[in-house]
């Protein structure tokens, strides 16, 4: 009689498809961190530390947004708190960008506001390229993310049409 024991492995090995897709980084520009550029690596382990009210939970709340969660469902509106757009994208120059892999290629999706509405645009470049010094100097001149994307960035990279529906965005990002 032989002893047959199940083999248990604690090591997680992502599939080839998983290695070829997924969230890489989150970029915040003039968002809830006033007039700052913030880059957060989402690969491997990340340690977010800070005092109470520093924005750690607000940052973590952005991850479900990338995967298609309704933005206003992420922000608590109790006690007169701001909407998603008012909190995360307070000015026309504010933006959130998610850098991700799609079929092995680095791409970005940029969230921005215009007239209190949230919009999404896909850009066929890496975050490093999108936020290059030259591109950010141009953004400072435009001082409007919507115009910067369609009038400047679109000259060098494919920029999608503006999406105003989270459902449309979710369909694309989850496909």
Regions found by a protein language model. Give the residues of each.
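Extreme N-terminal "head/tail" segments of very large remodeling/mechanoenzyme assemblies
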Residues: 1-128, 142, 159
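Electropositive, glycine-dotted interaction segments
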Residues: 112-175
